[in-house]
């Protein structure tokens, strides 16, 4: 009879397979299925916010702000959701009315807005985005661009029901 040889490495490998299997049997969800967690409000996201910013087709040219809005949990795209966008641009600071506008999402949950080039404000090139209607929890985002010379920025929302 051959006796199996167990060293520390083979023991830990075998034990980890067992633990992973127990996690799946106990209702564990693979990481991919958990990717639609509700989007959390970012610190400073609501700075210079103006309620009910008007729906606009564009706020200038040269920079593209875009993203996808989904239902938290399921990842279902949300159509007709109003997203507000504002930033400091070549037109002026975040308080400049020409830098504030809202857009509606398409059937696939996508939104986009062409605007003037975003410029650094307090040393960081960034945008502000908001969802604040009644159907879902309010979310304010403040994504920072990797470089002030970037000409696009994407910010996605996973909205939790209110």
Which residues make up each language-model segment?
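N-terminal secretory signal peptides
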Residues: 1-10, 19-25
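Beta-strand-dominated extracellular/periplasmic modules and repeats
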Residues: 35-162
């Amino acid at each position: 009879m051959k006796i199996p040889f167990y060293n520390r490495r083979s023991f830990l490998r075998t034990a980890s397979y067992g633990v992973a299997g127990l996690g799946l049997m106990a209702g564990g969800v693979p990481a991919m299925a958990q990717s639609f967690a509700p989007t959390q409000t970012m610190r400073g996201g609501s700075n210079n916010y103006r309620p009910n910013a008007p729906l606009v087709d564009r706020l200038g040219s040269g920079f593209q702000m875009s993203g996808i809005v989904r239902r938290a949990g399921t990842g279902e795209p949300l159509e007709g959701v109003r997203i507000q966008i504002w930033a400091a641009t070549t037109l002026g600071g975040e308080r400049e009315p020409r830098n504030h506008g809202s857009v509606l999402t398409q059937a696939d949950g996508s939104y986009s807005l062409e605007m003037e080039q975003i410029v650094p404000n307090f040393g960081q090139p960034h945008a502000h985005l908001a969802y604040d209607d009644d159907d879902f929890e309010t979310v304010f985002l403040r994504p920072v661009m990797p470089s002030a010379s970037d000409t696009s920025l994407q910010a996605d929302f996973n909205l939790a029901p209110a």
